[in-house]
Amino acid sequence: MATVNPLSFDRIFAKAPVMAILRGMPLEKSVELATRAWDLGIECVEVPVQSREAVEVLAAVVAAGAERGRPVGAGTVTTAERLAWAVSAGAAFTVAPGLDAEVARASLDAGLPHLPGVATATDVQAARALGLDWLKAFPASVLGPDWFRAMRGPFPEVPFVATGGIDASNAAAYLAAGAQVVAVGSALEDPEQLPALADLLKH
């Protein structure tokens, strides 16, 4: 039986249509950028765990988020081992670039909402069959805004997170096309993009 988790993506993404991804950064830099994201009004932060070293970074950002009541998730959770890392670091949810049924089920059983990557209608149907409500459209910059418009036809009830190649210059276009949330990374390091990101959070 799956563990009951008070968090769901409906709650995680309720306050802001933007998620921050902190990939491959040193611990102190990750905490700094997570804090910048929270100060902007971005509620949700993801730290990918592609190595054991990244687990320490995730744990530090989780601790910083706990002080503010902000959820921090583990990204690139593609194996059972990485799921174990996410659990040990205190992640609130897991994210993956693709859809792996075993990883998805294991994450849900561990009490962590799972956000799998999808790129086709077949992917969407498979993910929904596993009971996954929110889906990550990846890579969004390759799929393009028209992908979201097209998917609204057969899947009007599915909320998508546009991920991959999103920054302040194109985020609004993806939201207008039907993405419920956009995920940004390096944009947080660019002072010129911060005002535009802040504007997204006002709508």
What are these regions (language model features)?
Residues F93-A106, K136-W147, A177-L197:
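Glycine-rich phosphate-binding active-site loops on the catalytic face of alpha/beta enzymes
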Residues G41, G90, G98, G111, ...:
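Conserved functional loop/turn residues at catalytic and ligand-binding sites
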Residues M19, P71-G73, T94-V95, L115, ...:
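Structural detector of well-ordered beta-strand residues that form the stable sheet scaffold
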Residues V49, T76, P97-L99, V118-T120, ...:
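Short secondary-structure boundary segments
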Residues D39-G41, T120-L135:
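N-terminal/domain-start segments enriched in small and hydrophobic, helix-friendly residues
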Residues R52-A54, E81, E102-V103, T122-V124, ...:
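Short secondary-structure capping/turn micro-motifs that flank functional sites
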Residues T79-A89, T122-L130, W147, G153, ...:
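Catalytic cores of alpha/beta
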